[in-house]
Design a protein with these regions (language model features):
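Bacterial N-terminal signal peptides
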Residues: 11-20
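Bacterial Sec-dependent signal peptides at the C-terminal "C-region" and cleavage site
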Residues: 21-33
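Bacterial N-terminal signal peptides that target proteins for export
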Residues: 2-10
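Intrinsically disordered, low-complexity segments enriched in polar/charged small residues
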Residues: 9-12, 241
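Primary mode marks residue(s) on the alpha4-beta5-alpha5 output face of response regulator receiver
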Residues: 30-245
């Protein structure tokens, strides 16, 4: 691996870590204030399309395959043994991504519901993990038509994390707090404002991603994108598809 590639990976890991820390420290419930309100400028969601013939059946088949993919990994030790890695295991998170980077790389070229990029777990009081769902990804340049071919956009809403302003040296603290300025919880959402603040603007931090929770019985929760369903949507481990400019 070249020094440049290593620096890129370390920088992207830093960005992802900031996402997690900000999500864990942001206020929950009530109105959207401070960082949570600013998050609206950093998330792009595909629009729901009208339901087409065959969409429901296709989505149901993906959910069934996701269940099959998850079955061996109810014991998280098996996931670790099979090459899944916990992203930022020592940082408290509502949900932990166990990511298989080989699967993620393959997902930029094909869609196989039996090989998700990430397994989604909640941490138990005893230190173990309970399997909740999976995450599928695609490259950042994929069109919405391509996403629709993978999972119908009448059923699922794919999302990207966008408009990241990297803080200039010495301004680390402004990623956090009740009114953050930089990062994916920050008030800065445009290149112009970022450059005026001395930052570096990154239009797309991660590739396309979508969560599936096959064990849910309510269809709305199977394809949940928010915390109202008890799931966390702060994705941070979809390394494939990252775009730096």
């Amino acid at each position: 691996m070249s020094p440049r590639s290593l620096r890129s990976i370390l920088f992207l890991s830093l960005i992802a870590g900031l996402v997690v820390i900000a999500a864990a420290s942001a206020p929950r419930g009530g109105g959207q204030t401070g960082g949570m309100a600013h998050m609206m400028g950093h998330m792009y969601l595909t629009a729901l399309r009208p339901l087409q013939p065959g969409d429901r059946e296709k989505a149901d088949a993906i959910v069934a395959d996701a269940k099959i993919a998850m079955e061996p990994y109810k014991d998280y030790h098996r996931a670790l043994a099979d090459g899944y890695r916990i992203f930022l295991p020592n940082i408290p998170q509502p949900q932990y991504h166990f990511t298989n980077y080989a699967n993620g790389r393959e997902e930029t070229q094909r869609f196989d519901p039996l090989k998700p990029t990430s397994l989604l777990y909640k941490k138990n009081a005893d230190g173990g993990y309970t399997l909740m769902g999976v995450m599928y990804t695609d490259r950042v340049t994929a069109s919405e038509e391509e996403l629709n071919e993978r999972i119908p956009l009448s059923i699922a809403r794919w999302h990207q994390h966008v408009n990241f302003c990297k803080a200039p040296f010495g301004h680390w603290s402004e990623y956090f707090g009740p009114n953050p300025k930089f990062g994916l919880m920050g008030s800065i959402t445009t290149r112009e404002d970022c450059e005026a603040a001395g930052g570096v603007f990154i239009p797309h931090v991660l590739g396309w991603m979508v969560h599936v929770y096959p064990y849910e019985t309510d269809p709305a929760k199977v394809w949940s994108i928010d915390d109202d369903a008890g799931h966390d949507n702060m994705d941070h481990s979809a390394m494939p598809g990252m775009k730096m400019n």
